[in-house]
Amino acid sequence: SDVYKVSDQAKGHPINGFVAPGYEPVLEVFKENFLKRDEIGAACAVFRGQTPVVDLWGGYRDKVKTELWQANTMACVHSSTKAIMAIAMAMAVSRGYFRLNDTVASHWPEFAQNDKQDITIRQILDHSAGLPVVEELLTLEQLADYEGLGEILARQETQWQPGPRHGYHGWTIGMYCNE
């Protein structure tokens, strides 16, 4: 068989799914979340190209452990792409596309609006640019219109003097890095 079916327990939490040969360490780390980190419920899917090589789920959907986590249990996930974005930005730096201390406006002149001409790429990435929000209420259509969204982001005013203060740019960091 090209996959190993999984039906296991970790600290009383059922774990189900499959792992392809060579991906067994993913199962072990998945189980560790229950054994060592008091995970209640979780899922993990890994694809290599178009081929699924790991599909695991286990535990419970609720803290009182009455509803099992199923293969199709929905979960709200935040910040899952920030690591990928950071890797992409680091690769762009290593390939010489820009330097972290470059001003954003040196690559995106429209960004200089509203006294933002000195904000650096580093400040966008380290959450000190003063741009944690977009003041304009955005529609789904605007979020999907990258060119139009770029114009809105360029107009945005900072919420504080960039540099000395930090404030999590959780929703906006990806938008600015996209530019």
Question: What function would you assign to each model-found segment?
Answer:
Residues S1-Y23:
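Short, compositionally biased leader-like segments
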Residues V134-E179:
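Catalytic-site signature segments of enzymes, centered on catalytic residues
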Residues A71, C76-S80, A92-E136, A154-R155:
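Active-site helix/loop module of the DD-peptidase/beta-lactamase fold
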Residues V19-G22, L100, Q117, Q142-D145:
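Residue-level signature of the cytosolic catalytic core of signaling kinases
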Residues G22-V26, V77-T81, M85, Q117, ...:
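Hydrophobic (often cysteine-bearing) scaffold residues that line and stabilize catalytic clefts
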Residues N16-V77, R99, R155-Q156:
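Short, conserved catalytic-motif segment at the N-terminal edge
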Residues A90-Y97, M175-E179:
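Short glycine/serine- and small hydrophobic-enriched flexible loop segments
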